[in-house]
Structure formats: structure tokens, C-alpha cells
Amino acid sequence: MYSQHGAPMAPPQKPETFMLSNEAQQSLPHDAQVALQQVDNLKYFLLSAPVDWQPDQLIRRFLLPTGDYISCVLWSNLFHISGTDIVRCLAFRFQAFGRPVKNSKKFEEGIFSDLRNLKAGTDATLEEPKSPFLDFLYKNNCIRTQKKQKVFYWYSVPHDRLFLDALERDLKREKMGQEATTVAVSEPALSFEFDSSQSLYEQLTKAQQANSSSFAAHASTTYGQSASPVVRTVDAMPPPQMAPQMAPPSIPLLTDESANSQMYTSIPMPNPIPQNLIKREADYGAIQYDRNGMPIARIHQRHSSMPTFVEYSPAPSFVSSQYEDYSNRGLSFEPVTPPQHSSHIGPEPAYIANEDTGLYTAIPEMSTGSGFNPMMHLPPSNLASAHFPTPARTFHSNVYSVLEGSPTYKQRRRRSSIPPGAANPVTTGTHSPAPALSYAAHKPSDLRRSVSSSVAPGDTDDSRHESLHRSVNSTYTATLPQKNLMHEMSRNGTPLSSVGEHREQSSIPLTQAEDLPALPANGTVESGAPNGVGHKSDRYATGPVRRARSATMMELGPYPQKSHSCPIPSCGRLFKRLEHLKRHVRTHTQERPYPCPYCNKAFSRSDNLAQHRRIHEAQQDGQPLVHEDDLENDDNESVSHDEDESPSESVHPAVPGVHGMTSMPSSVALQSTMGSMMGSHMIAPQLLQQQI
């Protein structure tokens, strides 16, 4: 349906068909191909729903072939999707895949269980029963009940990952002879072969990596210059429905179909309109650039975890197409990230990313817009011509794929892997309060998300962070043995410093008053933070909680680079550090080089031994015992929980005498977050070893 220029390239690797060979994908029945095309249409809606909203518009719907509607809801300047609509999306995708749902209740339970990984305050908003928001969703058939529930931020939902996780659950049930929630009745589900040695998401990642070489091989031909003015598409993405008021008034709206290719040269144009208004590709130079300012030939060196379908996927913010015409890019119809300082122009709202929260919002009108927005006085891009060349655009590169959703999904413990010297295109002036002033100038306070009680506030602006850093230095050592604050905050709030900051400027997170008993509630900390971190409500309102940036500034996928591979052929797992690889190999060899001096029980990890020794010490002190099963589980679990937490990342540099401290294993993480269950003797295992 959509023309492809240049040499044919390998078909995109999609979750529904990545296990099939190229020949099998091409030979799918017509009904299956139509169903998969309908899935692509749904994906396009998930990509572009927040674009071109009217000032008074609150909801936008997409009609599924099943008769259900998927709704994108604008509420409090943020776009949302309900859990019920997420289930509807997945049920339709399973039906198009050839595995219709037969046990709806159990199917929904599995989806909502996965959605628990999207935390309130970070990837969702937690609504109280019968709140105005829930009432609006209920009246528009977005939810079935107005009970207390989470409503998810539009671009935090990992739609492809949810599909693969649900499919993997059913395939495992079938393999074990249990009843599955879906049943395979048609292609491509009947031809789908399941390899239980690794997750479907990992298999999709490897399939994309294998496909990227052939994808890049055709880059120079598929995306090269063409003499045809027909706008090209990527991966059969459907063209957007341009609003009539967005198009020049005298130019008829055209669809991007190959059958209409001859119409571009024969459209009668009125005399008052110059011919250069319809010039499309003549405005491009010999080299095209992607949204990150890279030459287009290099865009295919993407991270392997990024699906081909959303290679040009948007960041979670857009500028209205009144100023950003789709058809003037010659790549695909997806929205792209606006310049960092874009602001409100004219009567239609413009949307911009909040680099701290990963969300997007409507920008208020500013009288000094020319100082913030270098493109404000330029003509709209749909009028670009030889007289008004399309301006070069710079884009914020800290983005993640919309269909992959939040990078923190099932990766709550990952840390940023940006080197200390990496350039920071967003945050500057770490030693002055200038960033806070700049934030207030073009980021309205209503953006700031309410934080649930289970999520501790992260570091806000750099001036407050640095003043807290200085004031806590004298007391942090005294409070560390009572409660492992760094570990607790990394599990609850995932506080992260701004990308590009030096290790010495990394965070002591803003903790709750009860977590810092040695600090005065309104003393030195409050003096360093004028907005008042001594009061919980004030702290929650003074700034947004930073998103856990497991997707780093230089990487498009959520996984950091790893260079050490497991030597076991059937495993081949990759690790960032050699010590993590050695620790992982012990899970294969069952080597346990750390015996307990009390009972001679051996462990494969030193931190598990340290935790085990605390059981003996607690028994001697008359404290309640920690369940031994937790140690057994930790002894055999993978090192994914701490493979990205090196000593330099986990320990605060201002703590004297504590070096090389890593985070505690997951069984201690549960105890560290429950103050009532943790005594003053529960300290970090590495610190315990140093004391011994």
C-alpha cells in the first residue's frame, strides 16, 4: 500500500512475528496480514495520540476492530491511559496474533500484575475512589469501576513488553499442561515456536540485533534522496489524518498512496499561491539528519532493544503540527521531539518534555518568548521554501521508545551508566540556583506530580541538593549504621543526580524527617533548601521526582553496554563488570567459597555470608530470626540486582572510612524498607566485614 524506495530491506522484527522466518512472514494468510496491519494502526495511535489537541479537548479515542475504544485522556496537563484500556489493547493484539482470549478474568489478572511494576508517582497517578478524574474516565467508558486505582502516564506503558510477558505466561502454562488464558487458533500463533531457555523479550532483542545488520545495509538506498515527491514511510506506518485547519487552505488533502503518486505533478494551483509552497524534498541538502542531529545513515546503529517499528518513535512530548508539518521530513509520519525551549505560540497549545520527569505538558504563554524559543519568529515549517529554509533543529536526546514504555519496568534497581565526564545538554550550572530559576520560567508548577507515600522524594534542583550535601556530611556517618539510607532510598525513590554530573556531586537523597533522626527538622537542612525540606508536604511540592534514568543519555534502549559474556554456551549472559561475571559463573558451578565460621554453611557470595552471620548475631542478642529461605534464594539468584551498582555508584563520597560498599541483596532490601522490622544492628554487609 505504501511505496518503498530503493532495495528491499529485511522485514521489521515485531513481537507478533519475530520468531518466524522472512519467508514465513511473507507467506502468512491474507487475514493474518490484515490483522497485523490493524495492530500497526493501533501502534500508530499509541505513538501519536497526544498530537494536535484543541485547547478544550480532554479525550481522544481509537476504535478497535473488536468494537472497544482506546482513550487518550488529558488531565492535569498530562496524558493518561487506564489499565482497562491497556487490557483492551492487549486482548485485541492477542486476537490479531491468532490467540484469542478465552479466560478473560485470569488474563486481566496477569496484565494488572505486570502493571504493578509501573509505580505511582513515577509512571502513574494513584487516584482516590470516585475522584473527579475517575468520574470522568468512568463516564467515558475508560474504566469499569471508580475504586482506588492507578491511571498510567501515556508513554510509561511498555505495550510490547506487556504483550510478550502475557504470551510467555500462556506458553509456559501450555508447556506444563496447565490451562492457558488464550488459545492458538490461527496464524501466526500456530507457527510460533517457544524457546523456554530465555524470555521472549530477550529473544526479541536478539532478533532485532540480528536484523539490524541487514536493516543498516539498505540505509543508503531505502532512505536516500528520491526524485519522487511522494512522502516515504517507515515499516508501513499509516499516515496521519491531518486536521483540515492545519493544511494550507488552497491545497487539497492527499493520502500517501502509491496510486496517487501522479497527482502531485498535476494538481491545479491558484495563481496567488507561489509554486514553492508545494516543494517538498527540494529543501533538503545532500545529507539528512535524524531527531538527534545525527546523519541519517548512522541512525540505524540503534540499540538492539529498540523495536524496528518505533525506530523513529517520539519522545514523550510534541509540538503541534501547525509548526511541525509531518510531510516535510521525508522519513516517517511519527511526531518527534521539539527543541528544548519550545513554548506556547498562538492559540494552540504546544507540548514539551520535562527532562526531569520524562512527561510532557502544555507550555504557558511567555511574554519574553524570543529569549527562550529560538524558533518562535520563524515561519511554520509547512510554509518552508527557498525563501524560508527549514531551520536546523536540536533535540533533547534523553528519550525512550513509546512502545517499550518506562525504562524502569521490571528494572527498578538499574542505575544510570553515563560516565562522569559525559556532556550534559540539559542541566548546567550545578553550583548555582540558576537551573531552578530556569525551571520556574518555563515549567509550570502544576506539572509537578503528587508523590505517593510509598515513593520517597528524589533530589530536586541542584542548589538544594548541594546544600543538603554539605549539611549532612557531619551527621551521615552517625546515622548510617542505624539505617542504610543509601540502600533504602535506592529501592524506594531511586534518587539520581542529573546526567553528566560528577560523582562527587551525586546525591544524598532528600529523605523523610524520620530517616534522619540526627538532623534538626528545621535547622541546617532547611536553611540550605529555602523551600523547606523539613516538612513532608513542602518537600513533596517543591519539585518533581526524577525518573529513574536507566535509559541513559547516549543509549536509546534501557540496557547499558555489557562486555563480559558467560562462558557457558547455553547461557551466554552479558555483564558490565568482570566480578559480576565471576559471581554469576558460581551459579553454574555451585561453588561456595564463603563458609560461615559459626555453622560452616557455605555461600557463593560474600554479602550472603554477611547477612547469614547477622542471623547468628541476632540470635545471640535475642532478636527475632530472619527466615533462612531468603538467603537460599539470594544464594542462587542472578546478579542482575547489583550488576549495575558499582561501589563508586552506591557509596556517598562524603562518608569517611567507608569504601567499596555495595548495595545489599534483595532479601535485605525488604527489611531495610520496613523500619519496624529492622534493628539498629542491621547495617550494610560490607561495613560489617570491615568492622570484623
UniProtKB/Swiss-Prot annotation:
Q: Name one GO molecular function term.
A: DNA-binding transcription factor activity
Q: Is Transmembrane a UniProt keyword of this protein?
A: no
Which SUPFAM superfamilies does the record match to this protein? beta-beta-alpha zinc fingers (SSF57667)
DNA-binding region(s), chain positions: 56-165
Keywords, A to Z, come to: DNA-binding, Metal-binding, Nucleus, Repeat, Repressor, Transcription, Transcription regulation, Zinc, Zinc-finger
**Region entry Disordered: which residue ranges?**
406-507, 519-540, 618-665
Q: Could you tell me the superkingdom of the organism this chain comes from?
A: Eukaryota
Q: What does this protein do?
A: Transcription factor involved in sexual reproduction. Required for cleistothecial development and ascosporogenesis. Not required for asexual reproduction (conidiation). May act to repress medA expression.
Protein name (database record) = Transcription factor steA
Gene name linked to the record? steA
